[in-house]
């Protein structure tokens, strides 16, 4: 099982929208598929002793493990009631490299997923416009429009670099893992509104 991840006003707003897409407010127990994240997760000791992370991967080792477990008959649960703040304090080159590493790993996990240059342009445009609309709707002042564009550019250019080899295209898989969320329900997530986590000593 794994829990919800959220950001606050110290996070890039674009990343907060990514969290809202992958970590919605409603639990799924069990969920479909093998998406998960080990930043906030739990696994039976008996399962872990015989199923460990693939340390050769450049990222997404949690998803790769979940894929193996689902194939073996296990199930993955998403628990929205167990949230954590997840922050990335990164420069723009670091943002790009993180998405590049994840895309390289995704090639090993889902080799049918391919991102073209046209996909990159479409994703950058649609995601950035979506960020701008959502930020205006939620009264966000902590991230500038330029920063949202920069984030999305580095996100998708990094993903393209890591996923540049031509592969059999699965439109459904590509839509799920690369394309921006367009649901109005997602943009109404309470954690997309202006908020900042309290200092640790305040509980």
Language model region names:
Residues 16-22, 94-97:
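Short, hinge-like loop/turn segments at secondary-structure boundaries
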Residues 41, 46-51, 56-88:
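A short, conserved alpha-helix in the catalytic core of glycosyltransferases
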Residues 1-13:
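Short beta-strand-to-loop element that shapes/binds the nucleotide-sugar donor at the catalytic cleft/hinge
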Residues 10-17, 89-92:
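Short aromatic-enriched loop/helix-cap "lid" or pocket-rim segments at secondary-structure transitions
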Residues 98-104, 108, 112-203:
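Non-catalytic, C-terminal membrane-associated alpha-helical segments of glycosyltransferases
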Residues 7-9, 24-43, 56-58, 64, ...:
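A recurrent flexible, glycine/aromatic-enriched loop bordering the glycosyltransferase active site
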Residues 57, 85-108:
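Nucleotide-sugar-dependent glycosyltransferase catalytic core
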């Amino acid at each position: 099982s794994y829990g919800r991840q959220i950001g606050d006003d110290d996070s890039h707003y674009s990343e907060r929208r990514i969290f809202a897409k992958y970590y919605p407010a409603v639990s799924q127990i069990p969920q479909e598929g093998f998406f998960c994240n080990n930043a906030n997760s739990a696994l039976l000791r008996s399962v872990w002793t015989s199923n460990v992370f693939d340390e050769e991967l450049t990222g997404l080792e949690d998803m790769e493990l979940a894929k193996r477990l689902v194939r073996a008959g296990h199930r993955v649960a998403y628990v929205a009631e167990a949230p954590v703040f997840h922050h990335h304090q990164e420069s723009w080159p670091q943002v790009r490299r993180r998405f590049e590493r994840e895309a390289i790993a995704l090639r090993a996990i889902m080799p049918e997923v391919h991102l073209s240059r046209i996909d990159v342009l479409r994703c950058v445009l649609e995601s950035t416009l979506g960020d701008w609309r959502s930020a205006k709707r939620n009264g966000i002042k902590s991230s500038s429009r330029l920063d949202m564009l920069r984030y999305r550019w580095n996100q998708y250019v990094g993903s393209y670099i890591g996923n540049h080899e031509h592969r059999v295209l699965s439109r459904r898989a590509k839509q799920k893992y690369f394309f921006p969320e367009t649901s109005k329900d997602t943009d109404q997530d309470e954690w997309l509104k202006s908020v900042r986590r309290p200092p640790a000593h305040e509980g």
